[in-house]
Amino acid sequence: MTTDAILLTPGPLTTSSRTKQSMLRDWGSWDTDFNAITARLRQGLLRIVHGEGTHECVPLQGSGTFSVEAAIGTLVPPGEKGGHVLVPVNGAYCQRIAKICKVLGRKLTTFEYAEDAQIRPEDIDRLLAKDPSITHVALVHCETSTGILNPLHEIALVVQRHGKGLIVDAMSSFGALEIDARKTPFDAVVAASGKCLEGVPGMGFVLARRAALERCEGNCHSLAMDLYDQWVYMNKTTQWRFTPPTHVVAALDAALTQYFEQGGLAARGGAYAKNCRELISGLAGLGLRSFLPAAIQAPIIVTFHAPASPAYEFKAFYNAVRQRGYILYPGKLTAVETFRVGCMGQLGARGMAGAVEAVRDALQEMGLELANAE
């Protein structure tokens, strides 16, 4: 276990020693051993969603946002070819998808929700019925700015019934919350190496329905982000088109091996759910309220209301918690002051209890009066 501060963030995460050790070797990007790692990763990622035989895994260099942009740019035809994206918005990462569509020149329709409201399948149904020109829906599964969980399966069935394509940003859910391609129809699920799989950042991937991907030649605005070209080239050569992040790929391979050894999705999701319960309960005991009701809270990252005290200031709070070995995340809401605490990654021997204790001691040091303070 690392002696560095533990990252209680939505990614990057604190990784295992085994994952760190995997990055100590250098790899040739065209070497057959490295190509075997890429092939193994692609199969393992498909296995998580039961997509073998129906879907393709296309990895891409860069942060998760690179892969979201690549998915939209590749799967959604340009406006002159009729592409039109509906983006329901209940947080910052939904807004980012809408911005991507605007920058790429894809026709865009948005539908706005409050930051603490789930996206409703009945709204998607009504919007698709109202405007048949919409070709795709782009949905954030777990909105990282709050931790809200949107009803992916129900929305996917609505989108399928209307004959449209669904692109899912699953950055903060993939590997911990169920997405089953056999039951939940989608054209693409997009995720990245540095979240619930507990790799390091630097690589995204798109799990695309093969039949949808096969129709995408010539759609993309970009050479580097063309998932169709990347897919065809990888299948032909077993290699990446451009220099891959070799150490990141090796780390994800090691992390994915550990993921399956530890019990896969059920075990990872269960561990995060336990962390989440202990976090919310522990901070509630200090008088800190979570932003979302439990029914719509994903066990990935939790947003808390900042203490209602003039003595509270986030930077001082952050530094005090950091001195005690934990790194938090600022809030990302527009209406109220908040901070965020992640439930992912390697939390050390004391687990979430150590983080709760660090928050308690930090707030006491700042002179805040706490509920149930010892």
Swiss-Prot record:
Cofactor(s) this protein cannot do without: pyridoxal 5'-phosphate
Q: Which GO terms describe its molecular function?
A: 2-aminoethylphosphonate-pyruvate transaminase activity
Q: What is its EC number?
A: 2.6.1.37
InterPro entries attached here?
A: Aminotrans_V_dom, NH2EtPonate_pyrv_transaminase, PyrdxlP-dep_Trfase, PyrdxlP-dep_Trfase_major, PyrdxlP-dep_Trfase_small, SP_NH2Trfase/AEP_transaminase
Q: Which PANTHER family match?
A: 2-AMINOETHYLPHOSPHONATE--PYRUVATE TRANSAMINASE
Q: Which family is it part of?
A: Belongs to the class-V pyridoxal-phosphate-dependent aminotransferase family. PhnW subfamily.
Q: Which NCBIfam families match?
A: PhnW-AepZ (TIGR03301), PRK13479.1 (NF010006), transamin_PhnW (TIGR02326)
**Name this protein carries in UniProt:** 2-aminoethylphosphonate--pyruvate transaminase 1
| Species this chain originates from | Polaromonas sp. (strain JS666 / ATCC BAA-500)
Q: Which gene encodes it?
A: phnW1
